[in-house]
Amino acid sequence: MDPTVGWIALLAFFVVSIALVVWGRNGF
């Protein structure tokens, strides 16, 4: 498995979790 794939998955997970937190705070 390419290490880059792991980094992309980790980054995507981080971005999604941040987006969900911001989204939740805005009351959507």
From Swiss-Prot:
Membrane topology: Single-pass membrane protein
Main subcellular location: membrane
Key words, A-Z: Cell inner membrane, Cell membrane, Electron transport, Membrane, Transmembrane, Transmembrane helix, Transport
Location relative to the cell: Cell inner membrane
Heme as UniProt keyword: no
One GO location term (cellular component): cytochrome b6f complex
InterPro entries assigned to the protein according to its UniProt record, in alphabetical order: Cytochr_b6-f_cplx_su8_sf (IPR036143), Cytochrome_b6-f_cplx_su8 (IPR005497)
Any single biological process term in GO: cytochrome complex assembly
Stored Pfam families: PetN
Keyword Cell membrane applies: yes
Record-level Gene Ontology MF annotations: electron transporter, transferring electrons within cytochrome b6/f complex of photosystem II activity
Subunit field text: The 4 large subunits of the cytochrome b6-f complex are cytochrome b6, subunit IV (17 kDa polypeptide, PetD), cytochrome f and the Rieske protein, while the 4 small subunits are PetG, PetL, PetM and PetN. The complex functions as a dimer.
Family statement: Belongs to the PetN family.
Its biological purpose: Component of the cytochrome b6-f complex, which mediates electron transfer between photosystem II (PSII) and photosystem I (PSI), cyclic electron flow around PSI, and state transitions.
Protein name: Cytochrome b6-f complex subunit 8
Organism: Gloeobacter violaceus (strain ATCC 29082 / PCC 7421)
Gene name in the database record: petN
